[in-house]
Amino acid sequence: MDNRPIGVFDSGLGGLTAMRELIRTLPNENILYFGDTGRVPYGSRGREIIRKYAKQDMNFLIRHDVKAVLAACGTVSSVARDLGDALPVPYFDVLRPTARAAVEQTKNGKIGIIGTAATIASGSYRKEIERLAPNPDVYENVLHDVLRPVSLQEETGVSHQRRVITAAHLVE
């Protein structure tokens, strides 16, 4: 049995959700989590900077002798998948499972994608959804003002009130 940990990383702490699911489904596995709270959020940065950070994050985990890497960051999954595929250990990200869940759950073929500027600009989620479903009706929206408060709450524990107000403003 391979006792090395599974490495999980995100640009902040949002990937703790993925880590929690790993713990639930693989309770006997060791997990090493890296949340890059010093450079969060990645999604407002340029593609090459995101790729640089992702490579550094992946290399950090490899140096800690992980047996697999999970990029629990939608932005990294969108713009740096090829870097993960080049790792010497199995690589997983959140793009395909997220797109598959959206396709499976829609009842009318309409799918909304919210994400960082880099995620939306990459078109990765749209392409994956279109690969999985015939003629989906995909709507994409960059939510600058919502994603930062989510990151801030994760980092500081500050109330979600501002996030709710911002989200309400977007639907008016």
What are these regions (language model features)?
Residues 1-172:
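Non-catalytic structural scaffold of enzyme domains
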